[in-house]
Amino acid sequence: MEIGISKYRNIGIMAHIDAGKTTTTERILFYTGKQNRIGEVHDGAASMDWMEQEKERGITITSAATTCFWNDHRVNIIDTPGHVDFTIEVERSLRVLDGAVAVFDGVAGVEPQSETVWRQADKYSVPRICFVNKMDRIGANFYRCVDMIKTKLGAAPLVIHLPIGSEKDFKGIIDLISMKAIIWQEETLGAKFSYEDIPSDLLDKAQEYRNLLLDAAAEMDDEAMNTYFESNDLPVDLLKKCVRNGTIKGKFVPVLCGSAFKNKGVQPLLDGVVDFLPSPIDVDVIVGIDPKDSEKKIEVKPSEKEKFVALAFKVMTDKFVGSLTFIRIYSGKLKSKSTVSNALKNETEGIGRMLLMHANNREDITEARAGDIVALVGLKKTTTGDTLCSVDFPILLERMEFPEPVIEIAVEPKTTSDQEKLGIALNRLVAEDPSLRMSVNAESGQTILKGMGELHLEIIVDRMKREFNVEANVGAPQVAYRETITKSVEIDYTHKKQSGGAGQFAKVKIKFEPLEPGSGFQFESKIVGGAIPKEYIPGVENGLELIKEGGIISGFPLIDFKATLLDGAFHEVDSSPLAFELAAKGAFKEMANKAGPKMLEPIMKVEIITPEEYMGDVMGDINSRRGNVADMLDLGNNSKIITASVPLANMFGYINVLRSMSQGRAQYSMHFSCYEQVPQYVVDELKLEYN
């Protein structure tokens, strides 16, 4: 069925782990007719969770993409993981979406990962609507949840639905736009519902919230403002138009509610997606740059009549078709069997098959156009973040930024015959997941895997076994420590070597200085007047790039410093890029102990939800882990949220300690916050361990 681009909705479903994202998606697929039975996460039958590990653990690891239809609109949905170790999946999904549905647990409200995901959506200016889920659960409180959206996320919630009843008495919702109650029929699994008059005991509250809705909506449009002044009301179509405008401009976020598991509130949520979230033509124009001239900006218009431009946002291996590259098409058309250009790599790629994905089921298609999200089979050189475009229209879209890993493990094959298979498996997995890094320890020869958390690496090792049949021995997780300097120093260094034949000569004067946390390594050359020929200067930068990886104190990479090449000298015969590389390394070694080197460790932001009676034990334990409690919040229901900063080194295996301390009733999540200096007594212990 041919649907115009104005009726496309490319959306993501995002939330904290266990807020009910995948269940909500399953209901959407059921009610839009994509599935004829409902899959449940706790049965391991959810169709969007298709990896074996997802079915076993009941969590979503990769972003599954699917397409469905609602009220003559085409809705492309990406279901994203809520576990903090898989934040990268959320990041790359948000990069290619036009709108999002943020799902909140009606009991817990705004949880740590909800904040992380919300910040990511802010970064890409993704308009969103909120769905307060699990309104049937004990302790569910819609109004507290709305308040948390305001206070914890700094958002402007605009209430569209009110719940009728709560916990086991949750029956349906009041739609403030139509001012009707919607009640679902249990026996039809929520497929049938009726519009009724609002219960008399809720009329005043409904009118109060509708007035707030009208006030906010009328400000979006002059015509609406005039109508509102004259009649103190707005017609439904104009009210929807105003809410849509405000949502797309980011002025407010509509808040809806329901219980996906109990089949209530999902159809109005779909209406909200269609009514309030943008189509590809409603969002800001995408701007790229000319690969040959980064100053030259190129606008990409969302029309199939324009040249083809797309972004590859995910690469994965499928056991039936091989490598799959997911792309979002921003303009133009793409036909299977055609040739496109990878602008970043300056290579052409042949398009083999083109697939429309439903979780891991696939449907072959021959053409896709602006607004579509499709998977391509057989691309050889394209990786996550690359731009694909017409061969005669070179353009680069903004690349995605991926976080640095904070934890590492050593892996080695159990048998020597598995060595080659291990290499193939890891190369495939690293190609799929930009937050996974692989390197080989020069001294031990061990393969080192770096990732975003224990669960992340655990699942990678599990996938090596299941998908590639590689059994590996895995070392204990290690913290990704870093080193930095605290003082500025200038070093004059001359590298001279004379042995029969051509010698080596290079002289450098380099200023080393500390930078703000998070700055990484910066290099600048201030050479003027040819003191060092310009073809030798990259040798200096390369030497520093290589030697900084070995650090100063205990062999960890040196970060957050700047090296400025101030002066130097060369020899007509004996100088070379290699000589200047060696001179730079010599200057670095001389700087090492003069610049006040310090060790840094990753600090995690930890949020713990615990029953009140275990508060004392939990806080005492946090203090014993060198943690600092930053905040405590009362959740009601005899529960508290504790927010703390704790060194990652002291958080391994924490879940088991927390469970035994709270008889399994407390839960926690954590994400990387920053690098901080390691106390001296810990440095002394680490020196013994690592040297």
Swiss-Prot record:
Annotated InterPro entries: EF-G-like_DII, EFG_II, EFG_III, EFG_III/V, EFG_IV, EFG_V, EFG_V-like, G_TR_CS
Domain tr-type G span(s) in chain numbering: 6-281
The keyword NAD is assigned to this record: no
GO MF term (any one): GTPase activity
Compartment(s): Cytoplasm
Binding-site positions, GTP: 15-22, 79-83, 133-136
SUPFAM superfamilies, per the entry: EF-G C-terminal domain-like, P-loop containing nucleoside triphosphate hydrolases, Ribosomal protein S5 domain 2-like, Translation proteins
Transmembrane segments: none
Gene Ontology BP, a term: ribosome disassembly
NCBIfam families: EF-G (TIGR00484), PRK12740.1-5 (NF009381), small_GTP (TIGR00231)
Official protein name in the record: Elongation factor G
